[in-house]
Amino acid sequence: MDTAGPPAPAGTEGDGPGGSTGETSRRLSKEQIFVLVSAASMNLGCMMTYSILGPFFPKEAEKKGASNTTIGMIFGCYALFELLASLVFGKYLVHIGAKFMFIAGMFVSGGVTILFGVLDQLPEGPIFIAMCFLVRIVDAIGFGAAITASSSILAKAFPNNVATVMGSLEVFSGLGLVAGPPLGGLLYQSFGYEVPFIFLGCIVLLMIPLNLCILPSYESDAGKQSFWKLVTLPKIGLIAFVIISLSSCFGFLDPTLSLFVMKKFSLSTGYVGLVFLGLSLSYAISSPLFGLLSDKMPNLRKWFLVFGNLITAGCYMLLGPIPLLHIKSQLWLLVLVLVINGVSAGMSIIPTFPEMLSCAYANGFEDGISTLGLVSGLFGAMWSVGAFMGPILGGFLCEKIGFEWAAAIQGLWTLLSGVAMALFYLWEDSTMRRSKAQNILGTEEEQAALLPNDT
């Protein structure tokens, strides 16, 4: 079996629920249902709190004296500290405990979201900007803990259906991204700056008692593998580049798209939230489909990764569109491109986690929560690298050369990662064919040597 295959052989020996028989994948146990409910509530709540900033925060920050580059850094610092948190929490997941990390992360994220709602009371200038950075950093640490624990728990509970489950739960991430901007824009227009943050922060905090009651605990011994061994695997390194490029594309839009749409099409804050809807909704709808296909037909994962990246690159060329194409910027075209981008993002993002997991198992990593913690932490860390670079680079480039060219440059990331993965898979297939031919030839020679000599 090649390294692109599913991690099912390793998972069937595991002790988590769902790892024993094929029947379990068809009929969920009560424990698996509780895991799904917990992960879904976390995805929905945390992604809503993350995404509400898009429609109105850049404008508020401008009023407080923040430049486009500074706004991009406020968005981007979240990802930088989520990166650090994911690496640390992934390494020490077994020692801390997945359930405690999950609950504590949600508590921190919900609490600081409420604090973000009172920042408008601060004076404009350095004090406001510094507090924005501080609150976002603490929020990132909480979210990093929750998402690392969630991914590990899911992979442990559903070892044979990782992509399907994660793809299905992306519906709730997508719903959070879908509901966050329009809800945030509506609450901002109706009640002002404070209410969106206080409302959504309270929702996240109210989910904690539910998760305390229903989320199961998973215990495991600490593994001996390291992040360094994992990330130095060539295939893991390339998939990490794919994750970074896709995440940076999402992050690029946070500080730039709302300002571009407001200035270009003179839309209100509420309508800007609906523009974000095209990307989030199409991603939420398409992700379960690509997750199911990735588990049922693992050989399709490589094509999803490659073509998803290439389509995403084309979308960013048309987002402005790039002036070289001489296409007039129109609102319907922008929304259409965002919808296609949501589908292509689902196509390329969903297979990355099971691909990393199967590669780790194929290279000698043990089947257990410690390996799941390493892979989850690495996935979260690489996503955070892109989410850190995207807003900062996007804010800087938009300030210097405009949104149209900035979006096109952003698209080059996914073009490069798509081409790199295509070349790797071609090399991998060629190597496997040569190895198989050599094995067949060696077997035939051994059989010939064992046959009696007829002469």
Curated annotation (Swiss-Prot):
GO terms for biological process: serotonin uptake; spermidine transport; spermine transport. Residues 54-69, 121-126, 188-194, 254-271, 325-330, 398-406 are extracellular. The modification Phosphoserine is found at residue 20. Keywords: Acetylation, Cytoplasmic vesicle, Membrane, Phosphoprotein, Synapse, Transmembrane, Transmembrane helix, Transport. Residues 1-32, 91-99, 148-166, 216-232, 293-303, 352-376, 428-455 are cytoplasmic. The modification N-acetylmethionine is found at residue 1. It is found in: Cytoplasmic vesicle, Secretory vesicle membrane; Cytoplasmic vesicle, Secretory vesicle, Synaptic vesicle membrane. The chain crosses the membrane at residues 33-53, 70-90, 100-120, 127-147, 167-187, 195-215, 233-253, 272-292, 304-324, 331-351, 377-397, 407-427. Pfam families: MFS_1 (PF07690). Residues 1-26 are annotated as: Disordered. It catalyses: spermine(in) + n H(+)(out) = spermine(out) + n H(+)(in); spermidine(in) + n H(+)(out) = spermidine(out) + n H(+)(in); serotonin(in) + n H(+)(out) = serotonin(out) + n H(+)(in). GO terms for cellular component: secretory granule membrane; synaptic vesicle membrane. One of its GO terms (molecular function) is transmembrane transporter activity. This is MFS-type transporter SLC18B1.
